[in-house]
Amino acid sequence: MGITVLKNEGLDFHARISTPLSEIDDDIQKELLDLTKKVKIAGFRAGKVPVSIVKKKYGTSVRNDIIERRINHSVNHVIKEHNLNIIGRPKIEELQNESDKALEFTVKIELLPKITIPDLKKISLDRPKLEVNSKDVEEQLEKLAALTKNYTKESKAKIKDGDQVTIDAIGYIKEKAFEDGKLNDFKVIIGSNALIPGFEKQLIGSKTGSEVDVNVTFPENYHAKDLAGKDARFVVQIKAVHTAEPTVIDDEFAKKFQSNSLEELRTHFTKQIENESEEAINTIMKMNLFDKLEKLLDFDVPESLLEQEKNILKSGTDKNEQDESLLKDKSSKEITAYYNKLALRRVRIGLLLAEYAKSKNLQLEPDDLRKVIMQQARNFPGQENMIFDFYKNNPRAIEGLKGPALEDKAVQYIFNHEIKLKEKKYTKEELEKYLEAEEQRITLV
């Protein structure tokens, strides 16, 4: 076998490989001889089929199989001989297998970069810490009580905040009724903001049996694009008004929610608030860590990974409102530059974390995958069981989660063992403002 290196620069390795035809012919002959002992052909006893007959029937397929095996063997030999750290499948080009002298082809191999892990102990980050107070917990109890109110008492008085109103409504845009603009026996709690902004407020002061003209403007980000930003008028019939019976928040109330006492329910809400904030804090800290890492990384990345990441980003833009808003009114050149920069950042950080996980011998445990699946499920409120069933019945989908799961494990290991974390305490209100500001600041990743 002859090997001529054509290119060995950066992350590209190209070589021309040739194998004497005599070696190919020898392999073909051996394969055909083996087949004479195995194949069954009418008119011949088992194991007594002449080679010429076998060659006539199977010669082409045997030759193709031998050539494919030779190519794979040769490529693996080159990879081992040159100690190549490859990514993806090698590309075979300029294949010549009809020559009377040799099998020849060019192999193009993309390499992984050599990654030097930076000194992570020099990195420092703030670690927000939420201090849950009694006011936060009482707010959650009040919200729960509001959701479980009994609207049994019919009212003839004027509508006020907190009342449950049953309405019929027809919506008009430029005096023409529009599709999906009709409501029948629709129940709405005044002040719940369940309807278009401004709708509920205009019902206040009316009574059962009255007709109200409600004028609103659909939000620019309204889910029905054909209605977004448009002015509309609704003719509303007030069919019934009910007031809520007062809800007493006590031990009996708590028992309705699988708690033995009100104190136990308070403890549950304290932990829930802490857990919800912890997930948001971890996301922001991860992004802030990536911002720091981005400035430390300058290695080249495989072109195939870069293109793959750009395609993922582009295909997800229409589902990402923040991304879509950021690119609005940008030129094609600016959009391309944005995707190039973001894709490069993601690939570099992904490769670094994979190398870091390898250096620390981090292994995925079942709990690591469960956490990632739980995160996925939380993105689909009310459909959690469907998400769990999907991953339970799709092993290939589970495989797709292993990369993100290992990345998360590496990030948590870095937080716990490498970088300096400075704890900073926040109230719930302060933390919400901080997280909102950070979400606006950080680079999308």
From Swiss-Prot:
<dbReference type="InterPro" id="IPR001179">
    <property type="entry name" value="PPIase_FKBP_dom"/>
</dbReference>
<dbReference type="InterPro" id="IPR036611">
    <property type="entry name" value="Trigger_fac_ribosome-bd_sf"/>
</dbReference>
<keyword id="KW-0132">Cell division</keyword>
<dbReference type="Pfam" id="PF00254">
    <property type="entry name" value="FKBP_C"/>
</dbReference>
<dbReference type="Pfam" id="PF05697">
    <property type="entry name" value="Trigger_N"/>
</dbReference>
<dbReference type="GO" id="GO:0005737">
    <property type="term" value="C:cytoplasm"/>
</dbReference>
<dbReference type="InterPro" id="IPR005215">
    <property type="entry name" value="Trig_fac"/>
</dbReference>
<dbReference type="GO" id="GO:0061077">
    <property type="term" value="P:chaperone-mediated protein folding"/>
</dbReference>
<protein>
    <recommendedName>
        <fullName>Trigger factor</fullName>
        <ecNumber>5.2.1.8</ecNumber>
    </recommendedName>
</protein>
<dbReference type="InterPro" id="IPR027304">
    <property type="entry name" value="Trigger_fact/SurA_dom_sf"/>
</dbReference>
<dbReference type="InterPro" id="IPR008880">
    <property type="entry name" value="Trigger_fac_C"/>
</dbReference>
<dbReference type="GO" id="GO:0051301">
    <property type="term" value="P:cell division"/>
</dbReference>
<dbReference type="GO" id="GO:0044183">
    <property type="term" value="F:protein folding chaperone"/>
</dbReference>
<comment type="similarity">
    <text>Belongs to the FKBP-type PPIase family. Tig subfamily.</text>
</comment>
<keyword id="KW-0131">Cell cycle</keyword>
<keyword id="KW-0413">Isomerase</keyword>
<dbReference type="InterPro" id="IPR046357">
    <property type="entry name" value="PPIase_dom_sf"/>
</dbReference>
<dbReference type="GO" id="GO:0043335">
    <property type="term" value="P:protein unfolding"/>
</dbReference>
<keyword id="KW-0697">Rotamase</keyword>
<dbReference type="InterPro" id="IPR037041">
    <property type="entry name" value="Trigger_fac_C_sf"/>
</dbReference>
<dbReference type="GO" id="GO:0043022">
    <property type="term" value="F:ribosome binding"/>
</dbReference>
<dbReference type="InterPro" id="IPR008881">
    <property type="entry name" value="Trigger_fac_ribosome-bd_bac"/>
</dbReference>
<dbReference type="Pfam" id="PF05698">
    <property type="entry name" value="Trigger_C"/>
</dbReference>
<dbReference type="GO" id="GO:0015031">
    <property type="term" value="P:protein transport"/>
</dbReference>
<dbReference type="GO" id="GO:0003755">
    <property type="term" value="F:peptidyl-prolyl cis-trans isomerase activity"/>
</dbReference>
<keyword id="KW-0143">Chaperone</keyword>
<dbReference type="GO" id="GO:0051083">
    <property type="term" value="P:'de novo' cotranslational protein folding"/>
</dbReference>
<comment type="function">
    <text>Involved in protein export. Acts as a chaperone by maintaining the newly synthesized protein in an open conformation. Functions as a peptidyl-prolyl cis-trans isomerase.</text>
</comment>
<keyword id="KW-0963">Cytoplasm</keyword>
<feature type="domain" description="PPIase FKBP-type">
    <location>
        <begin position="162"/>
        <end position="247"/>
    </location>
</feature>
